[in-house]
């Protein structure tokens, strides 16, 4: 896919989109990302009578998560005095869109900017929308940067700056629904590739920047709100949390959140996984597999997804495939084989396609679904393992080298 296939929307283009209020006063606490009981406490503190607070919370909740408003003045069934009080003390603003890119395959990537909140300067993260036939998946970030330093992952080369708040995690979903026309009274961008019917965002995956389970409480709150039946109403079976293997929090995820689980596996031996996914030194494969087997509600209809990036001459032999089948014995599982997505400066290469197919065939014959993930958004660095904030990338990456690499990969997808 050539660089010409990529469309970058600048600030002028963004201004033409449905207008949402930006965070001009970040010092105000946001009502987004609060559980009902926490929102109720704040409203009572600001003078809302106890006898009214349940009704007021329900009203605000509906406007935030069903109607998708970003301005208190749009809450038409809330009294003027109440709206003025809310505006004076709180915000429901969206993050700033620094840049929006649209890949030739319809994948969209947003670079979003949030307030510093202890980081010393505003921070930026990336959120990616992947349209497919009959579904649209939003890939959400949980941290600014990452601590895990997985050797094949571009995000891992950006040091952790801070965790995202529950508000900032949810804001990615709210903003994407704004931009895609997935709220009432919002228009879908002309020419956008989205599902023909129903919701534009049908699935959410916590597979963006960061390790979600190192930000457990904020991720938990955000996902419980996203799956609330009176709001955004995403089924927990359509929310997938991907982890590199933080074993104690895997148990907590099953008990306290209950969404689908994905494991960034990538190797079947501890020595190799120690190198590819260094958290394995703390939580080795035996402990990780025990946590997976104990995950609540597992069945053939509710499987754990194991992600396995295909690295040439590293982890792609048939012997690796045999060991993978042994490792997953007794776990209802699907194995996503991911052709390695190149990024500037990496020493890894993608496995040959013929080898990937042989690997997949062996796993299929052993009884496991093993789809080969179609690379999406490579031309805008939106594919798996490529996310990294633009401000960080531009300081370290030679743009000409990147463009030369992408031209060399033309036609691969």
From Swiss-Prot:
InterPro entries: Aldolase_TIM, Methyltransferase_A, RlmN_N, RNA_MTrfase_RlmN, rRNA_lsu_MTrfase_RlmN/Cfr, rSAM
Cofactor(s) this protein cannot do without: [4Fe-4S] cluster
Free-text cofactor note: Binds 1 [4Fe-4S] cluster. The cluster is coordinated with 3 cysteines and an exchangeable S-adenosyl-L-methionine.
Disulfide bond residue pairs: 139-384
GO biological processes: rRNA base methylation; tRNA methylation
Domain Radical SAM core: 132-381
Keywords, comma-separated and alphabetical: 4Fe-4S, Cytoplasm, Disulfide bond, Iron, Iron-sulfur, Metal-binding, Methyltransferase, rRNA processing, S-adenosyl-L-methionine, Transferase, tRNA processing
Record's subcellular location: Cytoplasm
Keyword Methyltransferase: yes
Active site per database record: 126 (proton acceptor), 384 (s-methylcysteine intermediate)
Catalytically driven reaction(s): adenosine(2503) in 23S rRNA + 2 reduced [2Fe-2S]-[ferredoxin] + 2 S-adenosyl-L-methionine = 2-methyladenosine(2503) in 23S rRNA + 5'-deoxyadenosine + L-methionine + 2 oxidized [2Fe-2S]-[ferredoxin] + S-adenosyl-L-homocysteine; adenosine(37) in tRNA + 2 reduced [2Fe-2S]-[ferredoxin] + 2 S-adenosyl-L-methionine = 2-methyladenosine(37) in tRNA + 5'-deoxyadenosine + L-methionine + 2 oxidized [2Fe-2S]-[ferredoxin] + S-adenosyl-L-homocysteine
Any one GO MF annotation of this record: metal ion binding
Extra remark beyond the main annotation: Reaction proceeds by a ping-pong mechanism involving intermediate methylation of a conserved cysteine residue.
NCBIfam families, alphabetized: rRNA_mod_RlmN
Family per similarity comment: Belongs to the radical SAM superfamily. RlmN family.
HAMAP family linked: RNA_methyltr_RlmN
Known function: Specifically methylates position 2 of adenine 2503 in 23S rRNA and position 2 of adenine 37 in tRNAs. m2A2503 modification seems to play a crucial role in the proofreading step occurring at the peptidyl transferase center and thus would serve to optimize ribosomal fidelity.
Protein name: Dual-specificity RNA methyltransferase RlmN
Species annotation: Sinorhizobium medicae (strain WSM419)
């Amino acid at each position: 896919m050539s660089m010409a296939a990529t469309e970058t929307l600048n600030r002028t283009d963004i201004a033409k989109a449905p207008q949402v209020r930006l965070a001009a006063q970040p010092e105000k606490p946001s009502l987004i990302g609060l559980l009902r009981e926490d929102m109720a406490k704040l409203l009572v503190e600001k003078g809302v009578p106890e006898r009214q607070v349940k009704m007021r919370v329900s009203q605000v909740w509906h406007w935030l998560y069903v109607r998708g408003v970003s301005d208190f003045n749009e809450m038409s069934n809330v009294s003027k005095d109440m709206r003025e009080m809310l505006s004076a003390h709180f915000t429901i603003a969206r993050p700033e869109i620094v840049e929006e890119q649209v890949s030739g395959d319809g994948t969209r990537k947003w670079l979003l900017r949030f307030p510093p909140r202890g980081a010393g300067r505003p921070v930026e993260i990336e959120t990616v929308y992947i349209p497919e036939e009959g579904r649209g998946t939003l890939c959400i970030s949980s941290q600014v940067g990452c601590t895990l330093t997985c050797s094949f992952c571009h995000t891992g080369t950006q040091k952790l700056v801070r965790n995202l708040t529950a508000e900032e995690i949810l804001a990615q979903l709210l903003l994407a629904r704004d931009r895609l026309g997935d709220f009432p009274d919002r228009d879908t961008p002309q020419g956008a590739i989205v599902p023909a019917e129903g919701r534009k965002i049908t699935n959410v995956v916590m597979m963006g920047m960061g390790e979600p389970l190192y930000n457990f409480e904020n991720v938990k709150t955000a996902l419980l709100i996203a799956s609330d039946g009176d709001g955004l109403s995403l089924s927990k079976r359509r929310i997938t949390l991907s982890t590199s293997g933080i074993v104690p929090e895997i148990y907590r995820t099953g008990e306290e959140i209950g969404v689908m689980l994905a494991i960034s596996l990538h190797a079947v031996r501890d020595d190799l996984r120690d190198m590819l996914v260094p958290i394995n030194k703390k939580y080795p494969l035996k402990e990780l597999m025990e946590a997976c087997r104990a995950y609540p509600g597992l069945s053939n209809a509710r499987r754990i997804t194991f992600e396995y990036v295909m690295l040439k001459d590293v982890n792609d032999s048939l012997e690796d495939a045999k060991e993978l089948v042994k490792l997953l014995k007794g776990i209802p599982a699907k194995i996503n084989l991911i052709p390695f997505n190149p990024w500037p400066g990496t020493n890894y290469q993608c496995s040959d396609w013929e080898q990937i197919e042989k690997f997949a065939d062996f796993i299929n014959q052993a009884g496991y679904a093993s789809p080969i993930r179609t690379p999406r958004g490579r031309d805008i660095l939106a594919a798996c393992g490529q996310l990294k904030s633009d401000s960080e990338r531009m300081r370290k990456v030679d743009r000409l080298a990147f463009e030369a690499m992408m031209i060399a990969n033309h036609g691969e997808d």
